[in-house]
């Protein structure tokens, strides 16, 4: 009989503790110091980051955060906490939250599970599509924490779930619900967070996963390539990133006859700055100024029932298939 107690750690990227320049600067500093995210020579990157980028970007980004901040805190944190609560209720086992950068730390999440007697921990990074910049960074944080620990807990880490049937079903359901509320647009654009093209050239499988997710979503919705497509958002710096860029794609859709657009970001498990501000507001402005007539932003899955069911299914499969 297996007497081991299992716990679940949900992991997301992280968020500033407040919509202030100081808090944003601290968060971005930690995030952009990670070599998984920016692998530029440290002697070049660190002076550039601290001398130019952070002093300029932190105040600007803080204002953007202020525009989406919720009563209980950052949207990413609020929705992540709701996911933890819902998954814990569904599984009837301990579930904790950890962020790769900022609070709550991955370390504190694991310690919370250990204090509850968990000797087996399933780590679920909430990144459907694998990337060195996200999922691998979670692994790094865990390895760092246990670098000097003589006995490691029994870990199971979920690699990705880009083609999980319940994930695709949940995405499709969110699109259909939007159609019921707002009417069906001429086109569905799946906008994924971008990464440098160089990372993919060097073996990152992120783009392949994004393409497969889009393909499966199209099949689930019964849409043709004329009715659904994909692009990449949030480019940072001058280096070439995965294309087509969302900002450029939005400029050419209306001239092609697509006047009503539904936009969704399958790579984000929770709404955050990149969806609530960039995708919902900035991208809408680009599309409308380029001749668009109707722009519908479809929220992330957040704590949607099907999304929680998917998480529970992933966790359960790891427990009962041992």
UniProtKB/Swiss-Prot annotation:
Keywords: Cytoplasm, Heme biosynthesis, Iron, Lyase, Metal-binding, Porphyrin biosynthesis. It comes from the Bacteria. It catalyses: heme b + 2 H(+) = protoporphyrin IX + Fe(2+). Pfam families: Ferrochelatase. Its EC number is 4.98.1.1. GO terms for cellular component: cytoplasm. GO terms for biological process: heme biosynthetic process. InterPro entries: Ferrochelatase (IPR001015), Ferrochelatase_AS (IPR019772), Ferrochelatase_C (IPR033644), Ferrochelatase_N (IPR033659). Fe cation binds at residues 193, 274. GO terms for molecular function: ferrochelatase activity; metal ion binding. The keyword RNA-binding does not apply. The keyword Ribosomal protein does not apply. It is found in: Cytoplasm. Pathway: Porphyrin-containing compound metabolism; protoheme biosynthesis; protoheme from protoporphyrin-IX: step 1/1. It is an enzyme of class 4 (lyase). Catalyzes the ferrous insertion into protoporphyrin IX. Belongs to the ferrochelatase family. This is Ferrochelatase. It comes from Aliivibrio fischeri (strain MJ11).
């Amino acid at each position: 009989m297996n007497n081991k107690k299992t716990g679940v750690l949900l992991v997301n990227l992280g968020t500033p503790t407040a919509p202030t320049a100081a808090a944003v600067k601290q968060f971005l500093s930690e995030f952009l110091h990670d070599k998984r995210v920016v692998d530029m020579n440290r002697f070049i990157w660190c002076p550039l980051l601290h001398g130019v980028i952070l002093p300029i970007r932190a105040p600007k980004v803080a204002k953007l955060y202020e525009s989406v901040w919720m009563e209980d805190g950052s949207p990413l944190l609020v929705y992540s906490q709701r996911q933890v609560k819902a998954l814990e209720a569904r599984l009837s086992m301990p579930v904790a939250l950890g962020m790769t950068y900022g609070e709550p730390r991955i370390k504190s999440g694991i310690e919370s599970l250990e204090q509850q007697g968990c000797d087996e921990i399933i780590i679920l990074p909430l990144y459907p599509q694998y990337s060195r910049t996200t999922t691998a960074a979670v692994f790094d944080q865990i390895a760092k924490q246990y670098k000097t620990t003589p006995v490691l807990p029994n870990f199971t880490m979920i690699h990705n779930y880009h083609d999980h049937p319940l994930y695709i079903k949940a995405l499709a359901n969110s699109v259909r619900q939007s159609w019921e509320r707002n009417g069906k647009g001429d086109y569905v654009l799946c906008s994924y967070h971008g990464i440098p093209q160089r990372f993919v050239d060097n073996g990152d499988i992120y783009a392949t996963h994004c393409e497969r997710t889009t393909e499966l979503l199209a099949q689930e919705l019964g849409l043709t390539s004329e009715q659904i497509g994909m692009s990449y958002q949030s480019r940072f710096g001058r280096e070439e990133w995965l294309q087509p860029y969302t900002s450029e794609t939005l400029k050419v859709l209306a001239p092609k006859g697509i006047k009503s657009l539904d936009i969704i970001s399958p790579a984000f498990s929770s709404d955050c700055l990149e969806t609530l501000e960039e995708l919902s507001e900035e991208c809408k402005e680009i599309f409308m100024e380029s001749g668009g007539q109707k722009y519908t932003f479809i929220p992330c899955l957040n704590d949607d029932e099907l999304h929680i069911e998917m998480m529970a299914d992933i966790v359960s499969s790891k427990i009962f298939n041992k």
